[in-house]
């Protein structure tokens, strides 16, 4: 038997084919989230407060100090926060001390500082009831960077930039005339010597003394002449810098000094952060710069006078290590005193060495180091600036090397804790201004911290970050793997990062430093490729945010590969040679071969075993978790592996999932750390277990209660359902599974099923990657999933009175109300179809002035006779199912609702979706396809033992795509099924072809692993033998039920009157410009006419056509489409007199936009007509009046006569 048995958890044993001993367990896979947030609460938040405070007022008579803070218990539990659409957050109280310096009075007070979202154990946040994740960001590390550039004449020039965490950039560059310039904060350039003079080293001889004599320095000094003898060189330099930074303002040396101090030397305005100081000290340190250079002067111990290194010695690593303590101490330290007019007048300490130029043995080059300022110095120092200039000048002499900005030593990760700290800092600095003003304005005697602190800027900054930042994302909750993957995601986008359009090819490409740190495979296809990455399985962040990866140390003396683990960043790894994890070892731990495959600074080749420093801990340390779940990954093309890794994240949780027969051994750890399962927190014994809760009695007698979630709606509308795994009496240890989560079986990730798959064509139905499927998979609910959708209805106060939830809905028959309770809300368990009422609701209609009788009726019969309209919540199209739950929120019950809302009802509908034609299926190797036909079991091809095949795939999908892993999996899966075992074949260390064939032989299969298949319809065998086996197939989230859509009559857009688009709006299919061309080209005039009129925006025409169709009459001629009227109105709005005439030259009346609204709007030419009309009307009215008077007069006369 090939392979050996490995136990995964308590419920599963797999036969593993790995040959490499694992010396290091995988770290907790979500520690990047949890550790970062913990660090933020422990010391990050405190540091932010200490950065911004103390705050003094403008006259410096009062000061506000930070004392400490305390985080209290969260207001809601996790479950309550989810139900109430609230955030899972804890109140934070900060203690401040207000010191009045005039009276020495001190007031200490605790101030409520808002609610702070708290991370759950799963590494997520609950914000307004939704589960969110803060994605870690990959950004350029602060530090000093050097680059080279070639101009159009082929001349190589150099550039350098000091990039702080926040503050102004300082750049150096040389031009074609070999003059070196500096730029401050992207302004116009000035000779670099101007900045040196401003720092207090004004004489040319001083400049040559510091930097040594080189062409670049000479040319620049010649360019930088003393223009104004009235000013000293330093003052002149300061004025010149001020002119560049503030053009047009009156320049004085004093204002320039304060400006430069504010720009570079004020910790509030300029911050390198700990990582920036570390990177600058590392880059400008003399140790790295002296490496492999020939020293030109003897190095002498300043205390004893002993010669440590003779002149002419090559400074190898061993020589540098022997004098390391002296290099870190006072060796060759020189103190320069700036003149009194300088920006910073403190003495500048530098380390100065002379080496022989690599390009010219007769020349001596000066190396200036920054003498390692303390880690606490977070601003740039004059020593840093001079050392940077020295490094820059050395580059032209062939010393030092330029930086690669895509190297992971120069890119770091801002995890959730740091991102949050930055937001809080932003809020506090906004608050600071506010506090200063209040301190100055109000009466000092009565002030307390509470009165001067306004917490709104801080809470607003935090709220905005969680609610709308690009890095705060709605958790991808399709299945546990997608959750895990989302928590480990690294994004180069977001505030302070790159943008999609600006990111070039280099940033996106795989870099050699990604090895063991970022997965080279798992990244999205499309515009984000390479900008969104995933942490490799063993990746870990150090305190500066650089990704480390573990290696086994090799003892160079004995050649033994030890089990000592060393975590290295990309920078550190560059100094060593690393052997691959699959290098063969002897029993005693030495390398079995003299030559091993290894890497050094990105060069992959064979190296002598005796120069190897480290060895990989595991073959899977290269890839991310999702990629490590693909068996036979080493046999797949990388593009297909990328799709395979991404598609596993889109798997839908099935009703009864199966773990794969052929796994990689990663399934257990992924399920365990995903946060979707229930894991024992302590050792103990199960005393109670059912579907809703499990109770575990600890050894000390205390009781742990674990609640099991049943059919909760996940973020992506799938059923989040946990299943209890333990029974009463079981003994559990810390870390054991108590319940499986969704897409898990026996404590292992189980995204799909293990159907029997045959590679064969069948009636052409699997053309173009389509999948033919047996009806068994439908009947036996093999690929059935449950989906939950949430619908809500709220009642508000309107101007005409409150809306009401009721059973009494106008014009609705009793049969439509049969499942509503007495309140008018659907009962749980009711089966509902499209259009059924879920919540009966009525809204008051506008009422006319009531007559006396109507008012009387109102008084007698109450409000029943009032006019209301039906605004009930109904089941939308495509959403029929069973009512799973109803939640009612009212003010009376103490629920927090939005203002104006009196009651909120949420209805959850569960749908059971079986697999059907049009659903998307996939394997783990990027082999995806759509179900094209579901064939009755009796018609499917069957094996010689009578077992029908479940799925038929097209064999043409394999060769061109080069994902051969699927075929290996197929054969090994069949052997596993026959032997009744589960198999683990870890990536890059899995089953070899010998293992595969020996297992196939052990299972009693044919030597080519193929078989004869019989046609289920005729019983005849097919002509050729077919590859049949078991392949792990998953159903993806792209389901036909979510996409299928049809419309007859539906909503129309207000302005254009054309049908809306999209399934969500119940829209129509767009018949665009090109489609119209097609009909025109065919000359299909009648079809074209009805598409542009009845079926689109001819308002009267479509009504008449609908009426004619329903009454069976002939359809009348179409009218004018609405879009034509829109065109006419647009031309009229441009001031053109546009009218439409029919064939009899009569003007055609067009519908007005607001019927009846613009009766008083008159066309210019119609004004005369209107005037004439008005005059005629007035004349007629006058005549009528006269006639009336005459008749009245006659009548009176007649009456008089009669009397």
Swiss-Prot record:
<keyword id="KW-0548">Nucleotidyltransferase</keyword>
<dbReference type="GO" id="GO:0032549">
    <property type="term" value="F:ribonucleoside binding"/>
</dbReference>
<feature type="region of interest" description="Disordered">
    <location>
        <begin position="1174"/>
        <end position="1203"/>
    </location>
</feature>
<dbReference type="GO" id="GO:0003899">
    <property type="term" value="F:DNA-directed RNA polymerase activity"/>
</dbReference>
<dbReference type="InterPro" id="IPR019462">
    <property type="entry name" value="DNA-dir_RNA_pol_bsu_external_1"/>
</dbReference>
<dbReference type="Pfam" id="PF04565">
    <property type="entry name" value="RNA_pol_Rpb2_3"/>
</dbReference>
<comment type="subunit">
    <text>The RNAP catalytic core consists of 2 alpha, 1 beta, 1 beta' and 1 omega subunit. When a sigma factor is associated with the core the holoenzyme is formed, which can initiate transcription.</text>
</comment>
<dbReference type="InterPro" id="IPR014724">
    <property type="entry name" value="RNA_pol_RPB2_OB-fold"/>
</dbReference>
<dbReference type="InterPro" id="IPR007645">
    <property type="entry name" value="RNA_pol_Rpb2_3"/>
</dbReference>
<comment type="similarity">
    <text>Belongs to the RNA polymerase beta chain family.</text>
</comment>
<keyword id="KW-0240">DNA-directed RNA polymerase</keyword>
<dbReference type="GO" id="GO:0000428">
    <property type="term" value="C:DNA-directed RNA polymerase complex"/>
</dbReference>
<protein>
    <recommendedName>
        <fullName>DNA-directed RNA polymerase subunit beta</fullName>
        <ecNumber>2.7.7.6</ecNumber>
    </recommendedName>
</protein>
<dbReference type="InterPro" id="IPR037034">
    <property type="entry name" value="RNA_pol_Rpb2_2_sf"/>
</dbReference>
<dbReference type="Pfam" id="PF04561">
    <property type="entry name" value="RNA_pol_Rpb2_2"/>
</dbReference>
<dbReference type="InterPro" id="IPR007120">
    <property type="entry name" value="DNA-dir_RNAP_su2_dom"/>
</dbReference>
<dbReference type="InterPro" id="IPR007121">
    <property type="entry name" value="RNA_pol_bsu_CS"/>
</dbReference>
<dbReference type="InterPro" id="IPR007644">
    <property type="entry name" value="RNA_pol_bsu_protrusion"/>
</dbReference>
<dbReference type="GO" id="GO:0006351">
    <property type="term" value="P:DNA-templated transcription"/>
</dbReference>
<dbReference type="InterPro" id="IPR037033">
    <property type="entry name" value="DNA-dir_RNAP_su2_hyb_sf"/>
</dbReference>
<dbReference type="Pfam" id="PF04560">
    <property type="entry name" value="RNA_pol_Rpb2_7"/>
</dbReference>
<dbReference type="InterPro" id="IPR010243">
    <property type="entry name" value="RNA_pol_bsu_bac"/>
</dbReference>
<dbReference type="Pfam" id="PF04563">
    <property type="entry name" value="RNA_pol_Rpb2_1"/>
</dbReference>
<comment type="function">
    <text>DNA-dependent RNA polymerase catalyzes the transcription of DNA into RNA using the four ribonucleoside triphosphates as substrates.</text>
</comment>
<dbReference type="InterPro" id="IPR007642">
    <property type="entry name" value="RNA_pol_Rpb2_2"/>
</dbReference>
<dbReference type="InterPro" id="IPR042107">
    <property type="entry name" value="DNA-dir_RNA_pol_bsu_ext_1_sf"/>
</dbReference>
<dbReference type="Pfam" id="PF10385">
    <property type="entry name" value="RNA_pol_Rpb2_45"/>
</dbReference>
<keyword id="KW-0808">Transferase</keyword>
<keyword id="KW-0804">Transcription</keyword>
<dbReference type="Pfam" id="PF00562">
    <property type="entry name" value="RNA_pol_Rpb2_6"/>
</dbReference>
<dbReference type="InterPro" id="IPR015712">
    <property type="entry name" value="DNA-dir_RNA_pol_su2"/>
</dbReference>
<feature type="compositionally biased region" description="Basic and acidic residues">
    <location>
        <begin position="1174"/>
        <end position="1195"/>
    </location>
</feature>
<dbReference type="InterPro" id="IPR007641">
    <property type="entry name" value="RNA_pol_Rpb2_7"/>
</dbReference>
<dbReference type="GO" id="GO:0003677">
    <property type="term" value="F:DNA binding"/>
</dbReference>
């Amino acid at each position: 038997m090939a392979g050996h048995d490995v136990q995964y958890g308590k419920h599963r044993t797999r036969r593993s084919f790995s040959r490499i001993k694992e010396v290091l367990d995988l770290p907790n896979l979500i520690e990047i989230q949890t550790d970062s947030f913990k660090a933020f609460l422990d010391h990050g938040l405190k540091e932010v407060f200490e950065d911004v405070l103390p705050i003094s007022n403008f006259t410096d008579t009062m000061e506000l100090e930070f004392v400490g803070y305390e985080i209290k218990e969260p207001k809601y539990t996790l479950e309550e926060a989810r139900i109430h659409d609230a955030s899972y957050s804890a109140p934070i109280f900060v203690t401040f001390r207000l010191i009045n310096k005039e009276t020495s009075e001190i007031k200490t007070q605790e101030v409520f500082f808002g609610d702070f979202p708290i991370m759950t154990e799963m590494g997520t946040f609950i914000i307004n009831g939704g589960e969110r994740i803060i994605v870690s960001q990959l950004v350029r590390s602060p530090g000093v960077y050097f680059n080279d550039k070639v101009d159009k004449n082929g001349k190589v020039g150099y550039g350098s930039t000091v990039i702080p965490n926040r503050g102004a950039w300082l750049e150096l560059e040389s031009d074609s005339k070999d003059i070196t310039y500096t730029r401050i904060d992207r302004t116009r350039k000035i000779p670099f010597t101007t900045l040196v003079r401003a720092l207090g080293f004004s004489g040319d001889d001083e400049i040559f003394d510091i930097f040594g004599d080189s062409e670049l320095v000479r040319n620049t000094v010649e360019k930088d002449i003393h223009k104004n003898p009235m000013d000293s060189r330093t003052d002149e330099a300061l004025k010149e810098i001020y002119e560049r930074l503030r053009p047009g303002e009156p320049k004085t040396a004093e204002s320039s000094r304060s400006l430069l101090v504010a720009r570079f030397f004020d910790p509030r305005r300029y911050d390198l952060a700990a990582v920036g100081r570390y990177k600058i000290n590392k880059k400008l340190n003399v140790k790295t710069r002296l490496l492999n250079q020939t020293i030109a002067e003897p190095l002498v111990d300043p205390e004893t006078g002993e010669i440590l290194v003779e002149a002419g010695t090559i400074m190898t690593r061993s020589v540098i290590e022997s004098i390391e303590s002296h290099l870190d101490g006072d060796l060759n330290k020189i103190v320069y005193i700036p003149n009194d007019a300088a920006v910073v007048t403190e003495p500048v300490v530098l380390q100065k060495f002379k080496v022989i130029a690599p390009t010219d043995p007769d020349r001596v080059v000066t190396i200036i180091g920054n003498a390692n300022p303390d880690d606490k110095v977070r601003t740039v120092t004059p020593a840093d600036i001079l050392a940077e200039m020295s490094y820059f000048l050395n580059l032209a002499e062939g010393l030092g090397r330029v930086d690669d900005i895509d190297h992971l030593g120069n890119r770091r990760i801002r995890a959730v804790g740091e991102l949050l700290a930055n937001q809080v800092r932003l809020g506090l600095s906004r608050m600071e201004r506010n506090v200063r003003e209040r301190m100055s304005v109000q009466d000092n005697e009565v002030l307390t911290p509470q009165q001067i602190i306004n917490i709104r800027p801080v809470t607003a900054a935090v709220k905005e970050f969680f609610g709308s930042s690009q890095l705060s994302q709605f958790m991808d909750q399709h299945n546990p793997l997608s959750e895990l993957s989302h928590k480990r995601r690294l994004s180069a986008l977001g505030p302070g990062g790159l943008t999609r359009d600006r990111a070039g090819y280099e940033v996106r490409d795989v870099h050699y430093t990604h090895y063991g740190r970022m997965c080279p495979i798992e990244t999205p296809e499309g515009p984000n490729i390479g900008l969104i990455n995933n942490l490799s399985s063993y990746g870990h962040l150090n305190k500066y945010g650089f990704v480390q990866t573990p290696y086994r140390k090799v003892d160079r003396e004995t050649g033994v590969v030890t089990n000592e683990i060393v975590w290295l960043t990309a920078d550190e790894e560059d100094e060593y040679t690393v052997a691959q994890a699959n290098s063969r070892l002897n029993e005693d731990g030495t390398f079995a071969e003299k030559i091993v495959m290894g890497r050094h600074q990105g060069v992959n080749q064979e190296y002598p075993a005796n120069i190897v420093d480290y060895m990989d801990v595991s073959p899977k340390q290269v890839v991310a978790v999702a990629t490590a779940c693909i068996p036979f990954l080493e046999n797949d093309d990388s593009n297909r592996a990328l799709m395979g890794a991404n598609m596993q994240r889109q798997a839908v949780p099935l009703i009864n999932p199966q773990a794969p027969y052929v796994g990689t051994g990663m399934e257990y750890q992924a399920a365990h750390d995903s946060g979707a399962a229930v894991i024992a927190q302590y050792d103990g014994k199960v005393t109670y277990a059912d579907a809703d809760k499990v109770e575990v009695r600890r050894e000390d007698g205390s009781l742990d209660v674990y609640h099991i979630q049943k059919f909760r709606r996940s973020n992506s509308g799938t059923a989040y359902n946990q299943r209890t795994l333990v029974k009463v009496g079981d003994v559990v240890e810390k870390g054991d599974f108590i319940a499986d989560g969704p897409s898990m079986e026996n404590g292992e990730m189980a995204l799909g099923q293990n159907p029997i798959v045959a590679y064969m064509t069948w009636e052409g139905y699997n053309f173009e990657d389509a999948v033919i499927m047996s009806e068994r998979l439908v009947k036996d609910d093999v690929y059935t999933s449950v989906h939950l959708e949430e619908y809500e209805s709220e009642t508000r106060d309107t101007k005409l009175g409150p809306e009401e939830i009721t059973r009494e809905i106008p014009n609705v028959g009793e049969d439509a109300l049969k499942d509503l309770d007495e309140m008018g809300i659907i009962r749980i368990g009711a089966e509902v179809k499209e259009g059924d009422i879920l919540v009966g609701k009525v809204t008051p209609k506008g009422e006319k002035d009531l007559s006396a009788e109507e008012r009387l009726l109102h008084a007698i019969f109450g409000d029943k006779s009032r006019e209301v309209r039906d605004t009930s919540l109904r089941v939308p199209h495509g959403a029929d199912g069973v009512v799973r739950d109803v939640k009612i929120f009212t003010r009376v019950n103490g629920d927090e609702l939005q203002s104006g809302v009196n009651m909120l009802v949420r209805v959850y509908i569960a749908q059971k979706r079986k697999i059907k034609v049009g659903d998307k299926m996939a394997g783990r190797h990027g082999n995806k396809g759509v179900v094209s036909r579901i064939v009755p079991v009796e018609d499917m091809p069957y094996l010689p033992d009578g077992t029908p095949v479940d799925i038929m795939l097209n064999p043409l999908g394999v060769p061109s795509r080069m994902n051969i892993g699927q075929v290996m999996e197929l054969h090994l899966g069949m052997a596993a099924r026959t032997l009744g075992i589960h198999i683990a074949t870890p990536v890059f260390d899995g089953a070899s072809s010998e293992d595969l064939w020996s297992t196939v032989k052990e299972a009693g299969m044919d030597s080519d692993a193929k078989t004869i298949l019989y046609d289920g319809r005729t019983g005849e065998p097919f002509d050729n033998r077919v590859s049949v086996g078991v392949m792990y197939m998953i159903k993806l989230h792209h389901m036909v039920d979510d996409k299928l859509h049809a419309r007859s009559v539906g909503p129309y857009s207000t302005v254009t009157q054309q049908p809306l688009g999209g399934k969500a709006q119940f829209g129509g299919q767009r018949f665009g410009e090109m489609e119209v061309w097609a009909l025109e080209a065919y000359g299909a005039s009648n079809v074209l006419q009805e598409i542009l009129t009845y079926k689109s925006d001819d308002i009267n025409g479509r009504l008449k056509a609908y009426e004619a169709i329903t009454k069976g009459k002939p359809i009348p001629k179409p009218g004018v489409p609405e879009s034509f009227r829109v065109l006419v109105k647009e031309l009229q709005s441009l001031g053109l007199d546009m009218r439409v005439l029919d064939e009899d030259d009569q003007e055609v009346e067009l519908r007005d936009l607001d019927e009846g609204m613009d009766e008083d709007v008159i066309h210019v030419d119609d004004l005369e007509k209107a005037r004439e009309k008005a005059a005629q009307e007035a004349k007629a009215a006058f005549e009528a009046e006269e006639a009336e008077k005459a008749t009245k007069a006659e009548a009176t006369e007649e009456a008089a006569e009669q009397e």
